[in-house]
Amino acid sequence: MRQRVVRHVDARGVRVGWANGARDDARRRRRRRGGGGGDGARAVRGEDVYDATYAMRDRDYALDIAERSHATRARAAGDEWFYGELAYGDARRVLRRAARVVGWDDDDAESTSTSSTAGEFVDLGSGMGKMVTCAALTGLFARSRGVELLPELHDEASAALETFYERVRDAGMSVECSISLSLGNLLTFDVSNADVIYIHATCFTPELLHATAMKLANECKSGTRVLIMSKQLPEGWVFEAFDGGYMALAQPQTHWKLDCWMYEVRRGSSSS
């Protein structure tokens, strides 16, 4: 049974999402290749649902909410409040790679993996909830969870989640994934059952990065995969690079890409 967080959000001004020409070209290619079925067709429908959900909630809109929240009451040090997100196509690609999907870079590949797909995705600092819904749309996770520190951003993400469910129904899709968004501190959020963890750490202070690394090292099960943006975790401890350990991922509304460092938690054969 899906988990939903219902919040009342005041009406805001309409902001139309930025259209990426390269993304649209890729979508048209997937439509031609995918035909009436297969993972390529599902990827296109998922992207349509995603775009419809966040059409009025683009990156600049979310950044404005985060900035105003921080100005009203600072809950994070320095620029830790700063908002960032990934373009849908690259978010999907890196999630498929982390979930061990064979042919992760090909949307026409079958959605099968070398391990169970009934796992859990966690976004530490989930913002507008976009990675959480993207993970749900991949069909690779049984649960997709996020935690956000800023109340105003969490409220908007909760409203967007309601829109997401509406768009899924409108598209005649079925998303077999339990989705939850929580308000709270990432350092106290439960990650013990997570199979894939995503952290947009571009503006993390050294102190927060260290605390996050300690949390993951102490709480994650062996085999958990961690995707962290713009920052690196200390290798040779419990964090080992997997599958090359790196991807450059696109952001919406800019041509600049961000570094994504990819790790797997390894505790040895005697650890669980």
What are these regions (language model features)?
Residues 205-268:
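C-terminal substrate-binding/active-site "lid" region of AdoMet-derived donor-dependent transferases
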Residues 143-148:
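Conserved SAM-binding motif I beta-strand of class I
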Residues 117-127:
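Conserved class I S-adenosyl-L-methionine
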Residues 187, 192-207:
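A short SAM/SAH-binding and catalytic strip from SAM-dependent methyltransferases
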Residues 1-11, 26:
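N-terminal chloroplast transit peptides
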Residues 129-141:
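Conserved SAM-binding loop of SAM-dependent methyltransferases across substrates and taxa
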Residues 9, 13, 17-21, 38-117, 154-191:
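S-adenosyl-L-methionine
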